[in-house]
Amino acid sequence: MLFRSNPEAAAEVTRAVKAVTTKPVIIKLSPNVTDIVSIAKACEDAGADGISLINTLLGMRINLRTRKPVIANKMGGFSGPAIFPVAVRMVYQVANAVKIPVVGMGGVSSAEDVIEMMLAGATAVEVGAANLVNPYICRDIIRDLPEVMAKYRIENLSEIIGGVK
């Protein structure tokens, strides 16, 4: 079942998980869809406690010498700073459509990125691929946040969540 692109299937999976746990259920959404908002709303209606987005974009590379795909599956997950604008857009769209918390991720690699995600509507921000480049990236972001907040006259991060309408 390809529940990533079908609102009804995503709702069904959400309900099934909610039925077997009392813990909060946060649904991670794929960006490889035409309408992420309808999927997020279906998950919310099915009882999701939060939405997390985005996962990797589908990508592909071809070896010029062999003229074959670089990876055996032909396509795979594309992540890192290049997907950040896509992630910000989708966080903005979903945060403006649901009432549950939204966790933003996808290409986050700086304190500025954290603030941008929160302005788009993220109530929390995750760092993924940047950890592979710099295992201390989370420490660095936390260290840099006060200075960046001061630069943009932000006293408390909670005041900027969803600040862009």
Regions from the language model: what does each represent?
Residues 25-50:
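Active-site glycine- and acidic-residue-rich loops that bind
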